[in-house]
Amino acid sequence: MAKAFVFSLCLLLVFNGCLAARQSQLSPQNQCQLNQLQAREPDNRIQAEAGQIETWNFNQEDFQCAGVAASRITIQRNGLHLPSYSNAPQLIYIVQGRGVLGAVFSGCPETFEESQQSSQQGRQQEQEQERQQQQQGEQGRQQGQQEQQQERQGRQQGRQQQEEGRQQEQQQGQQGRPQQQQQFRQFDRHQKTRRIREGDVVAIPAGVAYWSYNDGDQELVAVNLFHVSSDHNQLDQNPRKFYLAGNPENEFNQQGQSQPRQQGEQGRPGQHQQPFGRPRQQEQQGSGNNVFSGFNTQLLAQALNVNEETARNLQGQNDNRNQIIRVRGNLDFVQPPRGRQEREHEERQQEQLQQERQQQGGQLMANGLEETFCSLRLKENIGNPERADIFSPRAGRISTLNSHNLPILRFLRLSAERGFFYRNGIYSPHWNVNAHSVVYVIRGNARVQVVNENGDAILDQEVQQGQLFIVPQNHGVIQQAGNQGFEYFAFKTEENAFINTLAGRTSFLRALPDEVLANAYQISREQARQLKYNRQETIALSSSQQRRAVV
């Protein structure tokens, strides 16, 4: 009996200890006693060879409350953002530019394969370029040796003989090694790549490696949200990026341990700005900082069946480049050609799919076979004005993205919203019922107010382009576009986030009886009816100034 009691007591202590540890891990998102919010620009910047990465301090109270972290990535033309994965699900919005993104799902086949014809054409082009270079060099030498004609002719004859000898050797080698080439010649094969452009939303699950490349004619800019409080993150609440190439720097700079920023400098980018690369003395034994760097070089070479020099290249030894590198020439990989007709066909398919979902009342008729793991659809474009879910010709438009539009969001438990408001347009006062909202200002400006449960305005600020602010769950918020209009993108921490409005045709006030309004607000019944029916719009509201201008 005594042994059973001791065992029960020990089990109870272990259970309480685990529960306390779990509560301490989740304490940041449970302690949302926010007295002040602020729209901020990034706090930290890493300068790379072909771009930059900026991050917001995730240790701020509002980020801790929402359980998120955020970064902004700028990739210059012909820049390659090296492969990496994160401990948390990511939602990426393409603010500007176009490019290519590749996501690697372990165990899935390489469905993009180079044909033998294209491979031969590539080799022929390389050989043709070499011959042209040789001809140009030969012409230069001939022009410089015009006075020594006899000696030049002798050298030409010698070169012709050497060229014939080389050609004979090549022909003999090609005739003697056809089977060897067939055995060891490997054409390029890789997993699917995806074209990305402005307005795209890309979902990346935790632990899935991805890379991106800017092949456009302007900078490629993307904003990333890391949902660090997700159940998919079994580590702590700190965002972590695991790079598989290069010599990367810590993007979030271990901001919980970083030096405090001086007052008056909050929100100013470049506080921790550093030149691209990393001093060798900060590294152990001259190794890099990617995942391969920590392995023993000999053991890594044996595992990959390569020589140690190749293994050291994977480890980033003697490589000063960090997260974003510049590609020499053009990045050549297998991708299907895209003409105007193909793009239009893809857009029509997306519109048809959207109409089918609307006809089904927003219901996703899933049978478990509509998408396989290896063919998951990772992106959706919500930048097209024709895709708007809410539109007012005098106020603006709003587009939403959730698990009905992009099924992978059900797995990640994230959703998104993009809005464009005209000058003085108002986003109806509302509260987020089941999610936090992380808002990034794409263009323009707006006045934003956020109110807590005590009726205090914990945010009352004019937000500007490039800033980010957080609206906690259930907190009231109102936004009015400024003179430049207001364009934003909002990350939502729930797969099907929705709001309750305080003004408009579908608002909380419209749903109450007249007598309840009259008694609650000490107004007459006539005033109660005016309060309910004076606003016929739903969410995108025109201002009184706009209505007077129209009249």
UniProtKB/Swiss-Prot annotation:
Which segments show compositional bias classed as Basic and acidic residues? 339-350
Task: Give the signal peptide, or none.
Answer: 1-20
Compositional bias annotation for Low complexity: 114-124, 132-148, 168-185, 254-275, 351-361
What are the UniProt keywords, alphabetically? Allergen, Disulfide bond, Seed storage protein, Signal, Storage protein
Bias class Polar residues marks the residues at: 282-293, 311-323
The UniProt annotation puts the region (Disordered) at 111-194, 238-293, 311-361
User: Tissue specificity, please?
Assistant: Expressed in seed (at protein level).
Q: Name one GO cellular component term.
A: extraorganismal space
Listed GO biological process terms: protein hexamerization; seed development
Q: Would the keyword Disulfide bond turn up in this protein's UniProt record?
A: yes
Motif NGXEET mapped to chain: 367-372
Q: According to its UniProt record, what is one Pfam family this protein matches?
A: Cupin_1
| Modification note | Proteolytically processed from a single precursor to produce an acidic and a basic chain that are linked by a disulfide bond.
Q: Region IgE-binding: which residues?
A: 118-132, 145-159, 161-175, 225-239, 281-295, 510-524
Family stated for the protein in its record: Belongs to the 11S seed storage protein (globulins) family.
Q: What does this protein do?
A: Seed storage protein.
Task: Tell me the PANTHER family matching this sequence.
Answer: 12S SEED STORAGE PROTEIN CRB, OS03G0336100 PROTEIN-RELATED
Q: Can you state the subunit structure given in the record?
A: Hexamer of two trimers; each subunit is composed of an acidic and a basic chain derived from a single precursor and linked by a disulfide bond.
Q: What is this protein called?
A: Prunin 1 Pru du 6.0101
Lineage of producing organism: Eukaryota, Viridiplantae, Streptophyta, Embryophyta, Tracheophyta
